[in-house]
Amino acid sequence: MSLPEKAFPVSWDQFHRDARALAWRLAGTNGRWQAIVCITRGGLVPAAVIARELGIRLIETVCIASYHDYSEQGELKVLKEISPSLLEEDGQNILIVDDLTDTGKTAAIVRAMMPKAHFATVYAKPKGRPLVDTFVTEVSQDTWIYFPWDLGFSYQKPIADGEIG
């Protein structure tokens, strides 16, 4: 798989710095969050960093699959729902975390589940930007972000796809 013309490879160090920067921004909002709901899988890593930095102990997940072949967004499917107890009060005092908002389709589904929650992503593209309350870096819509969990020295298919190496 070759990198697209506008590739943005992100190292583990850079992602950690950006996730901590997001935590700093969130700390400045004076939010008193009782829990984080992270959108899996991309939200897992920033949620762990943010939970540590802000002292949040409860992390819940919602799983919405959108990238089925690592290149294009497909049909959105909710694979795991949010715990009903966190849906009370429409997500008031809940922090939703993801790595990226791209088209905003995933964000819109989660926002509909928790309209009063605070939505934070590390990166935002213009189409998804209106659905996010806090983010760190905006990238152009035609940029493909390569996250460190997708990369070795080059893009690596997941082991489950049958190729090791």
Curated annotation (Swiss-Prot):
Its cofactor is Mg(2+). Coiled coil: none annotated. 5-phospho-alpha-D-ribose 1-diphosphate binds at residues 41-42, 98-106. GO terms for molecular function: guanine phosphoribosyltransferase activity; hypoxanthine phosphoribosyltransferase activity; magnesium ion binding; xanthine phosphoribosyltransferase activity. It is a peripheral membrane protein. It catalyses: GMP + diphosphate = guanine + 5-phospho-alpha-D-ribose 1-diphosphate; XMP + diphosphate = xanthine + 5-phospho-alpha-D-ribose 1-diphosphate; IMP + diphosphate = hypoxanthine + 5-phospho-alpha-D-ribose 1-diphosphate. Pfam families: Pribosyltran. Purine salvage pathway enzyme that catalyzes the transfer of the ribosyl-5-phosphate group from 5-phospho-alpha-D-ribose 1-diphosphate (PRPP) to the N9 position of the 6-oxopurines guanine and xanthine to form the corresponding ribonucleotides GMP (guanosine 5'-monophosphate) and XMP (xanthosine 5'-monophosphate), with the release of PPi. To a lesser extent, also acts on hypoxanthine. This is Xanthine-guanine phosphoribosyltransferase. It comes from Chelativorans sp. (strain BNC1).
